[in-house]
Amino acid sequence: MAGPRGALLAWCRRQCEGYRGVEIRDLSSSFRDGLAFCAILHRHRPDLLDFDSLSKDNVFENNRLAFEVAEKELGIPALLDPNDMVSMSVPDCLSIMTYVSQYYNHFCSPGQAGVSPPRKGLAPCSPPSVAPTPVEPEDVAQGEELSSGSLSEQGTGQTPSSTCAACQQHVHLVQRYLADGRLYHRHCFRCRRCSSTLLPGAYENGPEEGTFVCAEHCARLGPGTRSGTRPGPFSQPKQQHQQQLAEDAKDVPGGGPSSSAPAGAEADGPKASPEARPQIPTKPRVPGKLQELASPPAGRPTPAPRKASESTTPAPPTPRPRSSLQQENLVEQAGSSSLVNGRLHELPVPKPRGTPKPSEGTPAPRKDPPWITLVQAEPKKKPAPLPPSSSPGPPSQDSRQVENGGTEEVAQPSPTASLESKPYNPFEEEEEDKEEEAPAAPSLATSPALGHPESTPKSLHPWYGITPTSSPKTKKRPAPRAPSASPLALHASRLSHSEPPSATPSPALSVESLSSESASQTAGAELLEPPAVPKSSSEPAVHAPGTPGNPVSLSTNSSLASSGELVEPRVEQMPQASPGLAPRTRGSSGPQPAKPCSGATPTPLLLVGDRSPVPSPGSSSPQLQVKSSCKENPFNRKPSPAASPATKKATKGSKPVRPPAPGHGFPLIKRKVQADQYIPEEDIHGEMDTIERRLDALEHRGVLLEEKLRGGLNEGREDDMLVDWFKLIHEKHLLVRRESELIYVFKQQNLEQRQADVEYELRCLLNKPEKDWTEEDRAREKVLMQELVTLIEQRNAIINCLDEDRQREEEEDKMLEAMIKKKEFQREAEPEGKKKGKFKTMKMLKLLGNKRDAKSKSPRDKS
């Protein structure tokens, strides 16, 4: 015992050197006035206390200050009671050693700096080695005296601090458990109902005075949730370690007769309540020394500052998956519900109308979510069947088909014709998208694009006015003389400059580009064209034919002459079956997604006017109705059809992005509750029960070993017993560490479950259209967001604590193993060294004798 004790004593002397009134002669009475504790704290953390203001006569205040500062600022639990220090002339040596070892472990153990709260300039300290390297002979002698004399003296002077508040029996060091400033046996601090160990911060006063009921137990039996009753993960480990340190320290002060404490009580000792310091995140520090091992439990209660910092710092970004979900919710609230559904692209979101892009048409079909069915319901393809009425001119019919629903025409006519005609339809994108969305009802819903042209065209049957309208889509139409109307001619010329009317193959590309140009160029004209003929002006090619119905058809026929074949099949196919058109349109939509839906809408109006001024106004109303139906669909992101064609055209010119819905109409994402490393509650409690049984067995062994150490028996084996003592304390510390880790895991899983619930509720709220939100909804959103941030912060705090504890514990374990091996090696090396020394000495004597004999003989031989 002299070795470890001497090393610790030498370290204390170095730390207290230069402080007035502090003289370290031993590890017992020299610490009674409390100045030695304050001196060690002040050397490393001068910011924590004012040593010059302390008085050697004020024993109680000095000890109280040192114990409180060490516990609150450094996380070292107070194993000693200031009242005990005042009442005892010679404090318990083992308790002092255990407590001081925590100071050494905290200030000198590598890796502790990161765990403890920030210190302002720590003085470097040289860790004391178990061997008496820095230890002076005086220290060793004093240590030996203390080992025998002081321990036995302590036994005679038992103090109230070593008495259990529940059973009034003596509490040994291994059994000590401090809770709310009272000392208990671990086995005495149990739930009155379920007899399970009380956890720090998770118990309440029982019906009778001095009894307790575990909140967790109540949660199991009652409706409560475990997570709510569970104490913060930080407090438990700390309190448990404090309990261990307190037990070690108080057993020593309590004194000598460890026999007074019942062994059964020790075995029963469950890891009871902590000190009522639930928020300390740090775990006990394992002693760099063997002695420190006993103290590690005390280190458990690391500085509360960590917890405070964690709570103060918002961690919404941290929960990574959860945080991302939260961001998604915010995005949804902004108006992109696609994030909620997990879909990045929504059919309504793209604004292909303003800008005709071949790629846009294709993406729309992918956006066949629930809203697609609604869009399909729209009778956009119905106009297709109407074309038969436009039979007077097959080319005109074809052009009509192309104009009103170029997508339909493309799908219906021969594959080649359909492809070409689609490009001509700038509205095709929307139509194609919607058609793809609703393949089941192609006839009913020709395509969103068709619906838009219908609304713009005023004729009930887009096919009639479509013939001229097709020109913008089939850029060939612009070629038809623009004899009918000057505005139409202007538009036709605009379209014609970029698109060749005669070329059938090129029209697809030119038509798409022209459709975009025409949409932008005719935006202003379209506003003026809402009347029958002017409407056709929005579609330049269509306008020319629009005024003179027959000439227009002729011009369209001539312009489509090269593609006349395509047009005729289209006319035939269109009247045959609208459903066929829808699928074909889908196929064509792939190549022509670029066509702008918005631009297409005005074009159909012009086509309608072209067909006949009277029908065009009529058609416009049905088309508007169709669009209105689309607007009614919550999933439809397209501009409201109710707006007049002029308004739509104005929007087209600016091509503003359609505002996405706040998130309504999208399926809610199912929350993920379980993690990859999820541990069922049953497994956690089962392992904790096993740990408790092992702790009881260790306590029983510790009581017997403590009695031997205090009784002064086997003085020759004190060092060996001390090594065994530290090993036992370390083993207990490992169990307590694992127990606290399980508590962390349990708390983490509860927080994760709660976070999932909060996120789900938040998503349900965000899924509601923003226009329908009430003040209560907005207030609830703020509450949920704040709770989500708090949950994430708490989870981050737990993760940080676990990481820091693991790192520190690994270093402590390595240090402990090295010290134990060194101590055992010294014990084994001593006898071997003696044997070798004796053997070598005798051998040397013999060798010397032989050499002398040889020398004496040699001269004689020579002579």
From Swiss-Prot:
Region (Disordered): 119-162, 224-670
InterPro entries (alphabetical): bMERB_dom, CH_dom, CH_dom_sf, F-actin_Monoox_Mical, Znf_LIM
Consequence of substituting E817K: In a breast cancer sample; somatic mutation
GO cellular component labels: adherens junction; centriole; ciliary membrane; cilium; cytoplasmic side of endosome membrane; late endosome; late endosome membrane; recycling endosome membrane
Region listing for Mediates the interaction with RAB13 and RAB35 and intramolecular interaction with the CH domain, in residue ranges: 652-863
Keywords: Cell membrane, Cell projection, Coiled coil, Cytoplasm, Cytoskeleton, Endocytosis, Endosome, LIM domain, Membrane, Metal-binding, Phosphoprotein, Protein transport, Transport, Zinc
All copies of domain bMERB, residue ranges: 671-818
Domain LIM zinc-binding: 162-225
Biased composition (Low complexity): 143-159, 224-244, 439-450, 482-495, 505-520, 553-566, 638-656
Taxonomy, superkingdom: Eukaryota
GO biological process: cell migration involved in sprouting angiogenesis; cilium assembly; endocytic recycling; endocytosis; neuron projection development; plasma membrane tubulation; protein localization to cilium; protein localization to endosome
Keyword Phosphoprotein recorded: yes
Localization: Recycling endosome membrane; Late endosome membrane; Cell projection, Cilium membrane; Cytoplasm, Cytoskeleton, Microtubule organizing center, Centrosome, Centriole
Function: Lipid-binding protein with higher affinity for phosphatidic acid, a lipid enriched in recycling endosome membranes. On endosome membranes, acts as a downstream effector of Rab proteins recruiting cytosolic proteins to regulate membrane tubulation. Involved in a late step of receptor-mediated endocytosis regulating for instance endocytosed-EGF receptor trafficking. Alternatively, regulates slow endocytic recycling of endocytosed proteins back to the plasma membrane. Also involved in cargo protein delivery to the plasma membrane.
Domain observations: Probably exists in a closed and an opened conformation due to interaction of the C-terminal RAB-binding domain (RBD), also described as bivalent Mical/EHBP Rab binding (bMERB) domain, with the N-terminal calponin-homology (CH) domain. The conformational change is regulated by RAB13 and may modulate MICALL1 interactions with functional partners.
Name of the protein this chain belongs to: MICAL-like protein 1
Biological source species: Homo sapiens
